[in-house]
């Protein structure tokens, strides 16, 4: 939504107020009518508070249509308008502890004044505390216990009729429980979507190749306001009751707590995360306790709500133009905020993953000042269309790493620059490569790159690699941080005096590690290949490479086509191996490891190539149990006939041989239309008879 009007300075209060009203009304329309919010809550709150203060300082600037004089957005087209019997007001907000102390003082003073006890000492005010859900407020009307209508808040006076959609929410009773029910009951509450349900909904959206929802609140709002209630019925919406509008035919409960207990008796869903406290100290204690468990709650909340518990005290306190005096929303530090993206750098992870990182103008969000945020990967940057110079939405929730959620396209400067993934690692200068079908680009300097140093050393020392006993993570940390070891080759240059000086490393430990290093010099080619840490090359593939080529040099010099001839090596693995050995830095470290006095292994001739048999060039997959042949025997016969026996079914598979209890491989073959043979069919195939 375009915001082209220039932002006036504070020195022009008339123009500034008009601009603020325009910004807030545009945001209201996007939020309530389009269900496409384009301003973070914190930014909206900041603009709203500024307009409130401006109108307080300059009362002549207050207009009837100012956002400060109303509750929300106008009813959208497509739904029948509903006039609320009692207005659905919003709440004033508090952010700092001082705001809560001031609220409690205002309430206590007003109650004292209302009872002609001004200046006297009174007991602390009793409050009902509950959660502030991040969903959509609605009103439910029951007549003689039967659900008859549901409406959204709208502008607080007039909302939208969403009765048919709300009927699909299973947690909302269509008839109240109990024999004694009110003639009319107007229940106020929140429609929301639990985190687990939101995740499942987006999984379905992805599977159907449909647009995913940004967050549970957007999903709940969009689902509730569907013109087709059948769509709403497929969305996992929930509801919590927390307030009341109109009540006829029964007396009003004496306290807010009693009201919620009453609702539970009627079968209405009420949240159990609530408490009764006294005074400001009790309010702040509730806020802190909820904050500690916030991330573990099964739904999103953006704060807590405090309400004077006694109904008679609520009535004495009354209302201001847009909110009750007896209640306050205590909001958590904003989890989203706006700031400017000044640059995009890349960061190298311990496994070589290249991650774009946004460098930001400092912004306070989620309780901390944020200057950097992850952009995940190159595809995410493209998908979100994030550019250098953009005004971006930054999200930080709990201990989660800050991330850039999106950019405000209407604020994009003309010179905003697209991100370009570098071709060389910023740490070591090695080539950056991205394998087909992978979202992550990686530095190929695995043995050399300082950013990957600790991971490379740890992997090299693993039991299934060179098995260097005594070289654990803490020792590796010291060796790297003291700059004693940069590559695996440096391990074999370590001396007794150097090791003995390490923290918590006695002479015996030093000698034991030296003995392990000496032992590790005599290994096998398969262990050495595995120890190099080549991506996608596990222990089994390392053995296949060693068996196929016989020595290291042919592997290092092999083309992708030659690598594809190795058993169980597919295009992605072949590309990964080829990239690793194509990087000159890796070859240098390998030569250092093979230097005299360093690592050795017995080498042999390459495995003889299978003669061109009847199945030369064919790929066969075995699955299940054959009646007379073991898996190994069948594999040996197929390989002798020139076939490649693969471990998984793909479009490149020519035949699948299936025995008893064949599983997913058989299903995959049938799905792809690949010929499936039994044991007799296998024998015919080996005899040259194509099924």
Swiss-Prot record:
Its EC number is 6.5.1.2. This is DNA ligase. HAMAP family: DNA_ligase_A (MF_01588). PROSITE patterns: BRCT (PS50172), DNA_LIGASE_N1 (PS01055), DNA_LIGASE_N2 (PS01056). The keyword Zinc applies. The active site is at 132 (n6-amp-lysine intermediate). Belongs to the NAD-dependent DNA ligase family. LigA subfamily. Residues 610-691 form the BRCT domain. Keywords: DNA damage, DNA repair, DNA replication, Ligase, Magnesium, Manganese, Metal-binding, NAD, Zinc.
């Amino acid at each position: 939504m375009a915001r082209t009007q220039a932002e006036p300075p504070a020195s022009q209060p008339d123009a500034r107020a008009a601009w603020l009203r325009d910004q807030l009304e545009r945001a209201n329309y996007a939020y309530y009518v389009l269900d496409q919010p384009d301003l973070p809550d914190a930014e909206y709150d900041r603009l709203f508070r500024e307009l409130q203060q401006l109108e307080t300082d300059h009362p002549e600037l207050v207009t009837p249509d100012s956002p400060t004089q109303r509750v929300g957005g106008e009813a959208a087209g497509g739904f029948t308008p509903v006039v609320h019997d009692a207005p659905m007001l919003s709440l004033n907000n508090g952010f700092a502890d001082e705001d809560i102390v001031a609220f409690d003082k205002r309430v206590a003073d007003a109650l004292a004044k209302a009872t002609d006890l001004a200046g006297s000492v009174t007991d602390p005010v009793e409050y009902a505390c509950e959660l502030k859900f991040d969903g959509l407020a609605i009103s439910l009307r029951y007549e003689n216990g039967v659900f008859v209508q549901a409406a959204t808040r709208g502008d607080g006076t007039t909302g939208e009729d969403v009765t048919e959609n709300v009927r699909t929410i299973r947690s909302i009773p269509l008839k109240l429980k109990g024999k004694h029910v009110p003639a009319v009951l107007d229940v106020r509450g929140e429609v929301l979507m639990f985190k687990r349900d939101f995740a499942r909904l987006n999984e379905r959206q992805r599977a159907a190749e449909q647009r995913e929802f940004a967050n549970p609140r957007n999903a709940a709002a969009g689902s509730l306001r569907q013109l087709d209630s059948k769509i709403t019925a497929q969305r996992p919406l929930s509801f919590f009751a927390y307030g009341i509008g109109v009540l006829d035919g029964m007396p009003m409960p004496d306290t807010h707590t009693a009201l919620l207990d009453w609702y539970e008796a009627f079968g209405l869903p009420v949240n159990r995360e609530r408490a009764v406290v006294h005074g400001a100290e009790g309010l702040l204690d509730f806020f802190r306790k909820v904050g500690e468990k916030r991330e573990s709650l099964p739904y999103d909340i953006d704060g807590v709500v405090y309400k004077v518990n006694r109904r008679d005290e609520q009535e004495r306190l009354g209302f201001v133009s847009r909110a009750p005096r007896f209640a306050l929303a205590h909001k958590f530090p904003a989890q989203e905020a706006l700031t400017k993206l000044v640059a995009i750098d890349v960061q190298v992870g311990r496994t070589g993953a290249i991650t774009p990182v946004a460098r930001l103008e400092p912004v306070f969000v989620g309780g901390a000042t944020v200057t950097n945020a992850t952009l995940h990967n190159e595809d995410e940057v493209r998908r979100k269309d994030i550019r250098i110079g953009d005004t971006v939405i930054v999200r930080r929730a709990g201990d989660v790493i800050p991330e850039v959620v999106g950019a405000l396209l209407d604020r994009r400067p003309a010179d905003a620059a697209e991100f370009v993934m570098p071709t060389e690692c910023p740490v070591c200068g090695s080539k950056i490569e991205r394998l087909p079908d992978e979202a992550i680009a990686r530095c190929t300097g695995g043995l050399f790159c300082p950013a990957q140093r600790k991971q490379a050393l740890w992997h090299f020392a693993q039991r299934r690699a060179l098995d260097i006993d005594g070289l654990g993570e803490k020792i590796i940390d010291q060796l790297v941080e003291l700059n004693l070891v940069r590559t695996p080759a440096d391990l074999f240059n370590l001396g007794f005096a150097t090791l003995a000086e390490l923290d918590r490393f006695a002479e015996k430990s030093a000698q034991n590690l030296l003995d392990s290093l000496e032992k590790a010099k005599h290994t096998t080619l398969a262990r050495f290949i595995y120890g190099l840490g080549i991506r996608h090359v596990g222990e089994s593939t390392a053995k296949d490479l060693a068996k196929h080529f016989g020595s290291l040099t042919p592997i290092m010099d092999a083309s992708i086509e030659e690598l594809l001839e190795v058993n169980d090596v597919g295009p992605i693995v072949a590309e990964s191996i080829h990239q690793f050995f194509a990087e000159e830095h890796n070859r240098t470290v390998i030569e250092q490891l093979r230097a005299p006095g360093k690592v050795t292994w017995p080498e042999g001739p390459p495995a003889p190539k299978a003669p061109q048999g009847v199945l030369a060039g064919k790929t066969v997959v075995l699955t299940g149990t054959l009646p007379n042949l073991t898996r190994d025997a069948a594999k040996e016969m197929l390989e002798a006939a020139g076939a490649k026996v693969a471990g998984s079914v793909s479009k490149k598979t020519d035949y699948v041989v299936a025995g008893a209890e064949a599983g997913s491989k058989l299903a995959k073959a049938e799905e792809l239309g690949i010929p499936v043979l039994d044991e007799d069919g296998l024998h015919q195939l080996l005899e040259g008879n194509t099924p």
